[in-house]
Amino acid sequence: MANAASGMAVDDECKLKFLELKAKRTYRFIIYKIDEKKKMVVVEKVGEPVLNYDDFAASLPANECRYAIFDYDFVTEENCQKSKIFFIAWSPDTSRVRSKMIYASSKDRFKRELDGIQVELQATDPTEVGLDVIRGRAN
């Protein structure tokens, strides 16, 4: 079903990969992009569980918008192992205005398709999605 505001549908693979990340911890991260020709949000890349934050950050293009899911593992002050699922709306200042508008207008509907997001971040440059920011928002 297409999103009335932006006309973007969501590929079934987007939900399937997210469920695998959430339930089976099959991936560390998922990068999604909008395929303007297909008018659809699609999976661009998945990161294996052995990958880390630096691998994730390197997967975000410098000049193009993306949506991303990052499964962040951490240890609490009480020494408990936890994880939080982050949704990141990546919209760099250097990306095209049209692209920013399409991603912004499609974001809420896309997020509703992914049940289990715990923290949302909006980022326009790498510092806004740095590991220190993720660590701070996870607690």
Curated annotation (Swiss-Prot):
Which GO-annotated molecular functions does the record name? actin filament binding
The answer, when asked if Cytoplasm is one of the entry's keywords, is: no
Q: List the GO biological process terms.
A: actin filament depolymerization
Q: Name one Pfam family in it.
A: Cofilin_ADF
**Keywords for this entry?**
Actin-binding
Taxonomic superkingdom: Eukaryota
Where exactly are the transmembrane stretches of this chain?
none
Q: Which cysteine pairs make disulfide bonds?
A: none
Q: Which SMART domains match?
A: ADF
Classification via Gene3D superfamilies: Severin
**An example Gene Ontology CC term for this record:** actin cytoskeleton
> What range(s) does the ADF-H domain occupy?
7-139
Q: Which PANTHER family match?
A: COFILIN-RELATED
Q: Which family does it belong to?
A: Belongs to the actin-binding proteins ADF family.
State the function annotated in the UniProt record: Actin-depolymerizing protein. Severs actin filaments (F-actin) and binds to actin monomers.
- Its recorded name reads Actin-depolymerizing factor 7
